[in-house]
């Protein structure tokens, strides 16, 4: 079930409320310090939230300096909307089609609609003055705060599960080398969860190899360089005294050597090469000067002898 536009708009509003700075205490008797929002202020806020809901952040000032001075809780509103715009991009473009996620989305939409009908900060009740006082804003935000905090936590958990489902889906598809089926999810994960993705993929050398070949097909130098450095850094972080991690590191390193030696696109530079040579020394110390280089050769999934040559020279 696709995320409705109304749901996205409402979610943008309430994420902003949930992330707002704590409201300062009102100074009794000092009416000049009251936080009031004019119709223009309200219009600007609504326009900015609509933009954020469309995954577009505004670089221009949303509220005047006078308004921000009187309403310091809104001083970081532009930065919050940039964050919200990113959240909206995630919710509008990402998701896994399964019943559990669909039910969660329906539940969130229902809860948000119920809250919006009763507590809409941008609509005045009949007879209310043209501007909203800070007291009225405090009352509305306080009434929503506990509910929205809980709901936001649920949304965060849903998002984590969505990413986990994407990673598992990509992993299973790569097992059969079905790269056409992973394209949309892979592009999302490359931007948002590359480390987590390769933490999963590196547990199976064939799956990792299929992904590296998929990256090569895309011929995106920036993505390729990020992938290369992500896997290198993960190999560096492994505990070589742990047999399972040692095996993962060896397979991952040989895959990288195969990939960089057969790729038509150059992703790394001298720095990446030096790291891989150093890792070869750490992971294949017995291969230096080898003739058959059985350990490296047994892990080589490409048709060339580059991994063997590197192990012989640097092991």
Swiss-Prot record:
Disruption phenotype: (Microbial infection) RNAi-mediated knockdown results in reduced replication of duck Tembusu virus in salivary gland after an infectious blood meal. Reduced release of duck Tembusu virus in saliva. Up-regulation of antimicrobial peptides in response to duck Tembusu virus infection. Increased expression of macroglobulin complement-related factor. It comes from the Eukaryota. Induction: (Microbial infection) Up-regulated in salivary glands following duck Tembusu virus infection. Residues 1-20 form the signal peptide. Transmembrane segments: none annotated. Keywords: Coiled coil, Signal. Residues 98-161 form a coiled coil. (Microbial infection) Modulates replication of duck Tembusu virus in salivary glands and virus release into the saliva, probably via the regulation of antimicrobial peptides expression in response to duck Tembusu virus infection. This is Salivary protein SG34. It comes from Aedes albopictus. The lineage of its organism: Eukaryota, Metazoa, Ecdysozoa, Arthropoda, Hexapoda.
